[in-house]
């Protein structure tokens, strides 16, 4: 049963779409976007050509139409009923740049892969970015969730962030404006990040390369990077590692439908080949329940879940005792 109707919604956008340079696609399959390779349709997907094109689109988008923004889909679970309204997917051509802005400063577009900013920093002897080499995804997602790993976090490097609001107005946010905390940004959820300016510090290139090699070796050794996965499934509770709690609760290797908690790293959920969004989310909530029953600790999702459930295939969130 279809939960969204992109052709009908596209008709509501009017003649203004003829002036857009980006691509509008009704009923766009989200399983081609997310790294899980699962989920339903985006009612309409818009891939803007650049920031000006994005602004032009937002100015003709009716206020009552839901708007969702996605990047490369690395940390995203889409439900099987699809995503109502418009999904904006930023393009590499318009938002994927990375360049040296000034001494020890790098400017990157929101869709720039995290590892590209790490490589740019290494090539120019700028320290403080090696941790990005081990984070899947793009800068936009890193800005939104304060992505971090291997001793570094996004909030340590951000100078300012460039964004567009729902009405098409542009904003420049300072580091303080972003309201960062662990795996979270307090910035307005309605803002679309288009890029950011980062700052590091002078460091020997050989030292940076060694740090990046260590990050790469760690990922290849302990993470299922060649599987269909969205990265870390749950945030680390204060004072604990999520994977240890999952392991102690018997979650390592647990399978539901086509979804599995990796046997290599049990805080990574994988699609074994035929998982639905329902399988993945149900597995995640099962893990949350098991961990709470074992340890009394409530795991919080790190993976973002979006969209509608199919009728009769809803997943109830585990709320604890």
From Swiss-Prot:
Pfam families: FAD_binding_4, MurB_C. Residues 36-203 form the FAD-binding PCMH-type domain. GO terms for biological process: cell division; cell wall organization; peptidoglycan biosynthetic process; regulation of cell shape. The active site is at residues 183, 232, 302. Keywords: Cell cycle, Cell division, Cell shape, Cell wall biogenesis/degradation, Cytoplasm, FAD, Flavoprotein, NADP, Oxidoreductase, Peptidoglycan synthesis. Its EC number is 1.3.1.98. Transmembrane segments: none annotated. Its cofactor is FAD. InterPro entries: FAD-bd_PCMH, FAD-bd_PCMH-like_sf, FAD-bd_PCMH_sub1, FAD-bd_PCMH_sub2, MurB, MurB_C, MurB_C_sf, Oxid_FAD_bind_N. HAMAP family: MurB. This is UDP-N-acetylenolpyruvoylglucosamine reductase. It comes from Agrobacterium fabrum (strain C58 / ATCC 33970) (Agrobacterium tumefaciens (strain C58)).
